[in-house]
């Protein structure tokens, strides 16, 4: 079942989103322990209007677990959301690293899909596809964009099948 995220989903979503940051090899993930990062992500989902704020998230629930999620928002607010990271209770070493995603990727006239992630336990079941289709079909009047690692052939194929174009 696909539904909007709630604050109580924060622990499961944080663990999933951490997988993306780890794959992206972000500086903050290299320098700060997994436990501390997941704790901050949990807080960002509930306490501040960061990219990962729960109102920007839809989850795929299966067996009473968050099997996957998609994070999307108005692209014109991307950097405003990013600055909210600094409103978290950051320790000095984390503050010195800076915000996790300081470069603007979204265009102001687009709605930006920040992330689509499926739990390793549920991969290969079409969850990412269903999340993307749900988002696009329930918000068909929006112009959607996303970024993808060009080496991620499986994701690129999925995005192309759903009508996304390489720019």
Per-segment meaning from a language model:
Residues 59, 65-74, 112, 117:
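Conserved beta-strand in the GNAT
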Residues 1-15, 23-28:
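A short beta-loop-alpha structural element at the N-terminal edge
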Residues 22-45, 56, 90-93:
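Conserved GNAT-fold acetyl-CoA-binding loop/helix
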Residues 109-111, 132, 138-149:
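Conserved GNAT acetyl-CoA-binding A-motif
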Residues 115-120, 124-137, 157-161:
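Conserved acetyl-CoA-binding loop-helix of GNAT-fold acetyltransferases
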Residues 74-111, 115:
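Conserved acyl-donor/pantetheine-binding loop and adjacent beta-alpha core of acyl/acetyltransferases
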Residues 45-59, 76-80, 112:
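A short helix-loop-beta-strand connector motif used in the catalytic cores of GNAT acetyltransferases and
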Residues 75-77, 145-148, 160, 165-167:
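Conserved catalytic-core motifs of GNAT/GCN5-like acyltransferases
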């Amino acid at each position: 079942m696909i539904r909007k995220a709630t604050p109580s989903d924060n622990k499961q979503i944080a663990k999933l989103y951490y997988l993306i940051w780890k794959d992206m090899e972000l500086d903050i993930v290299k320098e700060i322990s997994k436990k501390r990062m997941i704790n901050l992500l949990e807080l960002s989902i509930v306490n501040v209007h960061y990219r990962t704020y729960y109102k920007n998230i839809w989850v795929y629930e299966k067996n009473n677990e968050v099997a996957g999620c998609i994070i999307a928002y108005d692209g014109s607010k991307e950097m405003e959301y990013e600055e909210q990271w600094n409103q978290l209770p950051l320790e000095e070493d984390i503050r010195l690293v800076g915000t996790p995603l300081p470069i603007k990727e979204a265009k102001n006239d687009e709605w930006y899909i920040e992330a689509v992630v499926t739990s390793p336990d549920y991969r290969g079941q079409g969850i990412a596809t269903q999340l993307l289709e749900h988002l696009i079909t329930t918000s068909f009047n929006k112009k959607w964009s996303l970024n993808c690692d060009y080496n991620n052939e499986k994701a690129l194929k999925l995005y192309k099948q759903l009508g996304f174009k390489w720019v």
